[in-house]
Amino acid sequence: MSRGFGVTAGLDPEIASPLAARCQELGYSSMWSNDHPGASGLETLAEYAKGADRVDLGVAVIALDRQSPEQIASEVDRLGLDRDRLWLGLGAGFTEKPLTTMREALPGIREALPGIRLVLAAMGPKMSALGGAEWDGVFFNWMIPEFAAQAREWVEQGARDAGREPPPVFGYARTAVGTDAEGRLAEDESFYRDMHQGYRSHFERQAAPEGTVGVAAENAGDAQEELSRYRGLDTVVVRALASATFEDMGALARALTTTVSRAR
């Protein structure tokens, strides 16, 4: 299991670039950003690339109801992103038929974005199986370790049904360390729990108490132990719940580093 490091899109470039350099030095395999209406995940990846020349760069995820594949391709080119380093996470957003949308969109996405590894955002068994059958990777958000293991089985079953090797499985593990860790995790989680029916069903499926879907620990040792339980993931992405400063982000990255291998 390799380890990536992730932040929220729009992180100050003066922080993002040196943070990526620090994470590369520490042995992280990849740097990740989400994408949201207020900030571009691809722009955050471009800042990472200025500071780190070896780690993979991933965005998880861009919603196809907000950006078309052609728009994404244009941004990749404008920003000068190296396609060989990219993991491009894509999701259905608020479309009415997400499974159909992502199944039917894939050929056009591949045509618009050649040479880029495409990662499907999934929550339930059907989307997970689709990712296993047709995509280059599958990405999960907000999960307990037991769900990660179950999700991996769904992905692998989809791959078996399609007669192919299973693609890598990625996931964000929201992680806070310190005396206020539980509060920070609960606050971030509460925003997503009622965002839309997909997330409501996702949290209900896991049946985990509110404020516990992720890692909240008083010290780095306990956090490391919790992260090690996400064995269902090929790459666990530490989604940092820390102040948006280089000092705090860098300290968390250092505390949670481990020996990793490139996710290829």
PLM regions: where:
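Short hydrophobic interaction/assembly module
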Residues: 53-71
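Acidic (Asp/Glu)-rich catalytic clusters
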Residues: 18-25, 45-56, 73-86, 113, ...
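Short acidic active-site motifs
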Residues: 15, 43-44, 126-127, 180, ...
